[in-house]
């Protein structure tokens, strides 16, 4: 018997539609207590997966709202248990009253992520898919949403399951050799096993290599705006954000510390870092800000060098150029294109690959800048169409990769079956942690605590 849980599945702000969600063995009994169907039938006699119009009632039998009810019998539901939803008008007052009625009818308030946790425990999805649910909810870009949907659809899970099943079959053969010493691995079998391990290693290497991109996609690309004072870095930051975040004045040294904000530019999530202008002199506070600018430049994945196109290059510009030349990705934004040009853009183009003219004041060239940023971070190839996006997944994949590489090496040089088997078991343990086949209870609790109530 599973305890029946209930929760508000939609937000707490007024909206057109609000949803109350139930799961557990007592769903029909709870519905009969709070829902009066227009057709007069009890919940158990309503057609599954069909919307039924009726009244939502409070504990005293008073009508709260005119609602739609839909029931999903087990096992064909999100959680694998009997489930139902009540679709109300999206007033927080209505939803709270409906939830109170369900709790009075014997339901328990669902905990954070408890619906998805039940789906995982009942085998409706693995741990990778469960984590993708919260990734999809939190998605800030189309790429993040696409990756989450791919994971929810099982793209990454299928790859992990294929590797896991191949290693399980191979481990079974080695168990037979260990248990029955007279048995041996034939040459043909050995080559097949080496092929299995080679494929597993290649797939895991691709997954692990994709984590750096997945992490950037999820957290945002660290992007430093660097240049001399009054080049227009803060104005460019504000233009990219679409609102005034940084203070802009004609006085050099206005920005004295790094200012960080997220923005989606060219479909890429950026962590924009506005920095103090690079120059010598200034007071102690400004000098500290300049030092932080240099540190930010070293850590950034993308550097946007901002130059003042209305002035010739200076020693401060050259210093800023030297700081960003080693950046993994670099774009030179020649700002103030709305003013008479004094900077030799042709000479810059000979030195740097991506040189663009922009005007933070008028918005000219910002679309080209967005396109240039998107070109720096194209959607890369992934195993099965999904990227690892969190440290837990990457750690498990790394441990699996290391164990598979050890097993392959041991088998290739003719080590005994028990040695190869030990490495295979280590790989299986790590892969089981990745998809949830062999995961600790405390880790499961930690993962689902990240979810919102009602999901």
Please state what every model-predicted region is:
Residues 286-310:
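Inter-motif core of Ras-like GTPase G domains
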Residues 89, 307-310, 336-337:
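Structural motif
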Residues 1-146, 150, 154, 328-331:
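A glycine-rich (often HGG/GG-containing) alpha/beta subdomain
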Residues 108, 269-271, 354:
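Conserved beta-strand segments of alpha/beta enzyme cores
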Residues 53-65, 69-73, 253-281, 299-302:
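Switch I (G2) and immediately adjacent beta-strands of P-loop GTPase domains
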Residues 2-12, 142-264, 281-283, 312-455:
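C-terminal-of-GTPase-core extension/linker across diverse P-loop GTPases
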Residues 272, 306, 333:
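Generic enzyme active-site microenvironment
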């Amino acid at each position: 018997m599973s305890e029946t849980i209930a929760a508000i599945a939609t937000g707490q702000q007024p909206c057109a539609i609000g949803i109350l969600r139930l799961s557990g063995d007592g769903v029909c009994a709870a519905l009969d207590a709070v829902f009066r169907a227009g057709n007069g039938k009890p919940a158990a006699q309503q057609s599954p997966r069909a919307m039924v119009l009726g009244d939502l009632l409070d504990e005293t039998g008073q009508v709260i709202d005119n609602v739609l009810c839909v029931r999903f019998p087990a096992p064909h539901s999100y959680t694998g248990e009997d489930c139902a939803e009540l679709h109300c008008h999206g007033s927080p007052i209505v939803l709270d009253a409906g939830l109170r009625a369900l709790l009075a009818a014997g339901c328990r308030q669902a905990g954070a992520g408890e619906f998805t946790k039940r789906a995982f425990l009942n085998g409706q999805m693995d741990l990778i898919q469960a984590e993708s649910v919260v990734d999809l909810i939190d998605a800030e870009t189309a790429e993040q949403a696409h990756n989450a949907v791919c994971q929810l659809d099982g793209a990454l899970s299928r790859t992990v399951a294929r590797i896991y099943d191949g290693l399980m079959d191979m481990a079974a053969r080695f168990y037979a050799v260990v248990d029955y010493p007279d048995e041996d691995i034939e040459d043909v079998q050995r080559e097949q096993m080496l092929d299995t391990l080679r494929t597993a290693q290649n797939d895991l290497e691709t997954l692990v290599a994709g984590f750096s991109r997945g992490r950037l996609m999820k957290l945002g690309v660290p992007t430093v705006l660097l240049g001399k004072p009054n080049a227009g870095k803060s104005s460019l930051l504000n233009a990219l954000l679409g609102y005034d975040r940084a203070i802009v004045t004609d006085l050099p040294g206005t920005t004295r510390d790094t200012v960080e904000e997220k923005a989606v530019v060219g479909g890429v999530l950026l962590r924009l870092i506005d920095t103090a202008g690079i120059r010598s002199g200034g007071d102690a506070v400004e000098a500290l800000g300049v030092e932080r600018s240099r540190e930010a430049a070293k850590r950034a994945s993308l550097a946007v060098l901002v130059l003042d196109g209305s002035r010739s290059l200076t020693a401060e510009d050259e210093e800023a150029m030297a700081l960003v030349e080693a950046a993994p990705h670099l774009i030179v934004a020649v700002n103030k294109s709305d003013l008479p040009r004094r900077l030799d853009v042709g000479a810059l183009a000979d030195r740097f690959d991506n040189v663009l003219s922009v005007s933070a004041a008028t918005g000219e060239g910002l679309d080209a800048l967005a396109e240039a940023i998107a070109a720096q971070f194209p959607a890369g190839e992934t195993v099965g169409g999904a990227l690892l996006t969190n440290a837990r997944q990457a750690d498990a994949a790394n441990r699996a990769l290391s164990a598979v590489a050890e097993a392959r090496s041991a088998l290739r040089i003719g080590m005994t079956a028990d040695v190869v088997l030990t490495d295979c078991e280590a790989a299986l343990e790590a892969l089981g942690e990745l998809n949830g086949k062999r995961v600790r209870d405390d880790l499961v609790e930690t993962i689902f605590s990240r979810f919102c109530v009602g999901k």
